[in-house]
Regions:
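Middle-to-C-terminal accessory/interaction subdomains
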Residues: 1-199
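Secondary-structure capping and domain/repeat boundary segments
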Residues: 185-233
Length: 233
């Protein structure tokens, strides 16, 4: 607990035990969806059997998210600050539950990787259009069965339209607020568009993204180096 994660040796040591990218993706997901039945609850780790298997987080039980428990106000909650709270209550974010994330953020490599992967998500699955379209697709696929649920569980199912709209509002507005919280927490500035182009014979990988087309544009911070790789066919 006294190790300084800014020390490369300490960070390398813990990186041998946990899958760092998995830990980053897990925290980004929980923070973005505003799951407030976490991080002091619903936590599980797993690892592959055999030597060298690193511990990974498991994402599950996320129904305390997307604004549903908070009557539609979740999209403007600063869940990043919530996830690093040093003196939280016994539930849902006590100090022990935020400790690992807080310590890892002491390391500049982890910080930069966290910020860049968050930007990757802002540029892809966390766009408002993507989330609203996904929501509408799911809602449409089950809307015909809703009357059956309303007949069987009238008290819980009659608010179908209201709750779908809560999730739609969250999908529409969350990225705007979450980007502001990210910028404030890490003192980020100079968000800019970055264009990437590949020639026939290969693809490019930007951080965690491999675009399907040979041209792609995303938004990143000029003060955080990004990782670009050429991948031959």
């Amino acid at each position: 607990s006294q190790s300084n994660m800014a020390d490369p040796a300490a960070y390398d040591s813990i990186s041998k035990w946990i899958d760092v990218d998995n830990h980053i993706n897990y925290n980004i997901a929980q923070i973005f969806i505003d799951n407030r039945d976490w991080p002091g609850n619903n936590i599980k780790f797993w690892r592959p059997q055999g030597n060298g298997g690193k511990r990974r987080r498991m994402l599950y039980d996320t129904d305390f998210s997307f604004g549903i428990p908070w009557m539609g106000l979740g999209y403007n909650f600063n869940t990043l600050q919530f996830a690093v709270e040093e003196n939280g209550p016994d539930w849902p974010n006590p100090p022990w539950s935020t400790f690992l994330f807080r310590k890892l953020l002491e390391n500049s490599n982890y910080q930069q990787r966290f910020i860049n992967i968050f930007c990757d998500r802002f540029n892809t699955i966390f766009t408002s259009d993507n989330m609203v379209n996904r929501l509408d697709s799911i809602a449409t696929s089950i809307v015909d069965i809703i009357p059956v649920h309303q007949n069987k569980w009238p008290q819980s199912a009659n608010n179908w339209d209201y709750n779908v709209q809560i999730v739609r509002d969250f999908a529409q507005f969350r990225s705007e607020y979450m980007r502001e919280y990210l910028e404030s927490f890490f003192n980020l500035s100079n968000l800019t568009e970055a264009g990437f182009y590949s020639t026939p014979g290969g693809k490019i990988k930007i951080n965690t993204i491999v675009p399907e087309s040979n041209s792609w544009i995303g938004e990143y911070y000029t003060d955080i180096p990004i990782r670009v790789e050429a991948i031959p066919d």
